[in-house]
């Protein structure tokens, strides 16, 4: 409710991190971020990753508005989003016609992240989400989004976009877990930490909320943790093997 009533949602995010949990919180808070960024003279550029979009996407409309208002707008759109390939091609053409720079990801990788980087004169802002920037999905799927102005996080979100545009350039991350190179090793280390805690008689537990879990090494490590006495709770929407 606080985000819905604030005069400037960008200034509100600069004051402290904001967290929305759809569908229990309104996805409109995020739409407001894009709309304000599109109109604000303080905003210089907007970078967004897109995977699935609503049929009458307010996200796309806000990005087109931003481009027409002179912002440098860059959209990374995944053409291999299952069942949405044709739709994403259509959106790509519409964005390009409006003056948006459209990037089609990195060869050999699928861009599945949901990220926004907003470059501002008075302090950059980033949004990191688990769900598609899709108004329809946000009404039925439970997802999270963090909106922050913390420099150490915003810088790394910016680095993700730099990697996508120049994948030959080595990039290291300290705050974000970025697959395919860093996420799995970190998850395995975290599970190992809980195994060690359990063996030392300390409190040890793992809670996972995820769409699918099919990585054999991670599944095997969870079995190992369970056998070691780690309390494990898994909430999995789709495949579990």
Predicted features, each with a name:
Residues 1-206, 224-228, 238-241:
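N-terminal localization/anchoring segments of enzymes in phospholipid and broader phosphate metabolism
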């Amino acid at each position: 409710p606080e985000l819905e009533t604030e005069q400037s949602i960008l200034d509100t995010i600069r004051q402290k991190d904001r967290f929305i949990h759809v569908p229990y919180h309104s996805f409109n808070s995020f739409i407001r971020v894009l709309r304000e960024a599109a109109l604000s003279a303080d905003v210089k550029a907007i970078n967004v990753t897109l995977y699935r979009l609503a049929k009458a996407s307010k996200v796309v409309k806000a990005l087109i508005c931003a481009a027409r208002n002179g912002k440098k707008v860059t959209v990374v759109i995944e053409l291999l989003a299952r069942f949405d390939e044709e739709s994403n091609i259509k959106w790509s053409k519409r964005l390009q016609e409006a003056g948006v720079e459209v990037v089609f990801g990195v060869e050999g990788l699928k861009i599945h992240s949901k990220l926004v980087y907003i470059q501002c004169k008075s302090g950059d802002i980033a949004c990191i989400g688990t769900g598609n920037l899709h108004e329809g999905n946000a009404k039925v799927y439970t997802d999270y989004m963090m909106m922050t102005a913390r420099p150490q996080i915003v810088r790394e979100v910016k680095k993700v976009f730099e990697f996508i545009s120049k994948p030959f350039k080595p990039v290291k991350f300290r705050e974000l877990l970025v697959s395919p190179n860093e996420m799995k090793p970190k998850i395995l280390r975290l599970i190992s930490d809980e195994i060690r805690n359990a063996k030392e008689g300390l409190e040890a537990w793992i809670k996972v909320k995820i769409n699918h879990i099919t990585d054999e090494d991670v599944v095997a490590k969870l079995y190992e943790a369970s056998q070691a006495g780690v309390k494990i709770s898994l909430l999995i929407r789709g495949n579990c093997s």
